Swiss-Prot record:
HAMAP family: UreG (MF_01389). It comes from Tolumonas auensis (strain DSM 9187 / NBRC 110442 / TA 4). It comes from the Bacteria. The lineage of its organism: Bacteria, Pseudomonadati, Pseudomonadota, Gammaproteobacteria, Aeromonadales. One of its GO terms (molecular function) is nickel cation binding. Its main location: cytoplasm. The gene is ureG. Facilitates the functional incorporation of the urease nickel metallocenter. This process requires GTP hydrolysis, probably effectuated by UreG. This is Urease accessory protein UreG. Keywords: Chaperone, Cytoplasm, GTP-binding, Nickel insertion, Nucleotide-binding.
Length: 207
């Protein structure tokens, strides 16, 4: 769609290794033919996630910007989001018709949240390998994100996690809020996530 207003800003958070970068890769590859997309990644002292996404061919390199946050990565997405806001603005100016900018947080914990200034919508990724108790631990990422993604469900038998318990706990911690199981490596759950972004972000695919 041709857009004169600001792009939809989607914050993607979750603990280290949960699958944030993997999610961004599959979202970009499946959505890029229908929407104008860019990505901002956050790492403490490197631009590793930017490199991973670029080498994976998720988007053209100029559409992926890496922010080196230094110190605490939570601050860059919450208390002082200026570096990320500047990156989003620079991308918006460079590509005047952006529909979506994904902002990936640095590795964080269950208490990390995005500033409303920075993210219009938030997706939080956790994974089964952390154990079935993760949903019931709560925290803003679990309870307040717009969409919760429970990734790596294929590992459940190997780590002794019961998906029915995780489902029950998630429904209890997120009454009326959407969530989905996923195996991003195999593409499972990706269409559900895209449908959520498109519907709730009120995006119109280009012809």
């Amino acid at each position: 769609m041709t857009q004169t207003s600001s792009p939809l800003r989607v914050g993607v958070g979750g603990p280290v290794g949960s699958g944030k970068t993997a999610l961004l890769e599959v979202l970009c590859k499946k959505m890029r033919n229908h929407f104008e997309i860019a990505v901002v990644t956050n790492d403490i002292y490197t631009k590793e996630d930017q490199r991973i996404l670029t080498e994976a061919g998720a988007l053209a390199a100029e559409r992926i910007v890496g922010v080196e946050t230094g110190g605490c990565p939570h601050t860059a997405i919450r208390e002082d989001a200026s570096m990320n806001l500047a990156a989003v603005e620079a991308l918006s100016e460079k590509f005047g018709n952006l529909d979506v900018v994904f902002v990936e947080s640095g590795g964080d914990n269950l208490s990390a949240t995005f500033s409303p200034e920075l993210a219009d919508m938030t997706i939080y990724v956790i994974d089964v390998a952390e154990g079935e108790k993760i949903p019931r631990k709560g925290g803003p990422g679990i309870t307040k994100s717009d969409l919760l993604v429970i990734n790596k469900i294929d590992l459940a038998p190997y780590v002794g996690a019961r998906l029915d318990v995780m489902e029950s706990d998630t429904n209890r911690m997120r009454p009326e809020k959407p969530w989905t199981f996923a195996n991003l490596k195999a593409g499972q759950g990706v269409d559900t996530i895209i449908d959520f972004i498109v519907t709730h972000g009120m995006l119109t695919p280009k012809a």
